[in-house]
């Protein structure tokens, strides 16, 4: 069975065209791409409303609304002229086999990184970040984490496949350094001794974007950074289509400005997760996710053009 593809026995989770209508390449390891987009249609680790397996398809579908703009406002260049980005489709695994998904995703990521590519991944529920972190840590060593979310996902008593436990597991496996990591937009109960710097939603909404970014840069330093964005970081007014929405979150405008502010960090991997289109209204959650993903690519292109 191929590791990647856009057709499968249950092909309704996948698309036949790439994010932003970027080229499709199901053998990205031998390509000349700088960044490779991978969809991970998985939601078996969800504790709330399921449906995140349809997230990659929804993000790709709505991204056609963004593809027409050559110079994404307010950037003064076309990202596609600076970065070679391909979409390698969705990870193919036996639906119902969470372990196979995790192992295949980690192996896929390790192969891409060994070939000199960087990854932007679309979930799927947030558990998919853990196998991605395992692969990135093998290649880059211990990393800093910049984590946008309503939840810290540091629950210690979950099961093996649980979208609320990744950032308890990752420090224990030596994948990330919590002392150089920051969690942004949190507004649910969490353990205060988990080692992460937590910038709760109230702080982030009340402080200036520049002030928040300055603190993030100070915490992260020059470490390699993995950037993960759970769409429920946004207030449900801007992102209702997710499994565990929490009132009182960030606006889409503030989130975009914060992501842009991360341009100077040494970001080595990125993902956008937890889009569940069955609960969306007018595709606004998928559009927010696609826009944030595009901004992530733009900050990489901006750095390359310096």
From Swiss-Prot:
Entry EC number(s): 3.5.3.11
Keywords: Hydrolase, Manganese, Metal-binding, Polyamine biosynthesis, Putrescine biosynthesis, Spermidine biosynthesis
One GO process term, biological-process aspect: spermidine biosynthetic process
UniProt keyword annotation of Glycosyltransferase present: no
Catalytic activity: agmatine + H2O = urea + putrescine
Gene Ontology MF, one: agmatinase activity
Annotated PROSITE patterns: ARGINASE_1 (PS01053), ARGINASE_2 (PS51409)
Binding annotation for Mn(2+): 126, 149, 151, 153, 230, 232
Pathway: Amine and polyamine biosynthesis; putrescine biosynthesis via agmatine pathway; putrescine from agmatine: step 1/1
Enzyme class: hydrolase
InterPro entries named among the record's database cross-references: Agmatinase, Agmatinase-rel, Ureohydrolase, Ureohydrolase_dom_sf, Ureohydrolase_Mn_BS
Cofactor: Mn(2+)
HAMAP family in UniProt: SpeB
The family this protein is said to belong to: Belongs to the arginase family. Agmatinase subfamily.
Function recorded in the entry: Catalyzes the formation of putrescine from agmatine.
Protein name: Agmatinase
Species the sequence originates in: Klebsiella pneumoniae subsp. pneumoniae (strain ATCC 700721 / MGH 78578)
Top-level taxonomy: Bacteria, Pseudomonadati, Pseudomonadota, Gammaproteobacteria, Enterobacterales
Gene responsible for this protein: speB
């Amino acid at each position: 069975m191929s590791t990647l593809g856009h057709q499968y026995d249950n092909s309704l989770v996948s698309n036949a065209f790439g994010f932003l209508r970027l080229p499709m390449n199901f053998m990205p390891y031998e390509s000349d791409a700088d960044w490779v987009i991978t969809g991970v249609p998985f939601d078996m680790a969800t504790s709330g409303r399921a449906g995140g397996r349809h997230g990659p398809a929804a993000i790709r579908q709505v991204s056609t609304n963004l593809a027409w703009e050559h110079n994404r406002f307010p950037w003064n260049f076309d990202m596609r002229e600076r970065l070679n980005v391909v979409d390698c489709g969705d990870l193919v695994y036996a639906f119902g086999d969470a372990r196979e998904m995790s192992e295949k995703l980690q192996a896929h990521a390790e192969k891409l990184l060994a070939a000199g590519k960087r990854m932007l991944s679309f979930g799927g529920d947030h558990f998919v970040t853990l196998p991605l972190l395992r692969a990135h840590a093998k290649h880059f060593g211990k990393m800093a984490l910049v984590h946008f979310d309503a939840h810290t996902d540091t629950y210690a008593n979950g099961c093996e496949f649980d979208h609320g436990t990744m950032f308890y597991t990752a420090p224990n496996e030596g994948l990330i350094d919590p002392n150089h990591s920051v969690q942004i937009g949190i507004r649910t109960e969490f353990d205060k001794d988990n080692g992460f710097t937590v910038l709760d939603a109230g702080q982030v909404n009340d402080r200036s974007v520049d002030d928040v970014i300055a603190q993030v840069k100070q915490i992260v330093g020059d470490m390699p950074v993995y950037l993960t964005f759970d769409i429920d970081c946004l207030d449900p007014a801007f992102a209702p289509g997710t499994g565990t929405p929490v009132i009182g979150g960030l606006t889409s405008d503030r989130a975009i400005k914060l992501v842009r502010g991360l341009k100077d960090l040494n970001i080595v991997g990125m993902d956008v997760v937890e889009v569940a289109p069955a609960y969306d209204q007018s595709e606004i959650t998928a559009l927010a996710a696609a826009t944030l993903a595009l901004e992530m690519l733009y900050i990489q292109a901006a750095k390359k053009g310096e």
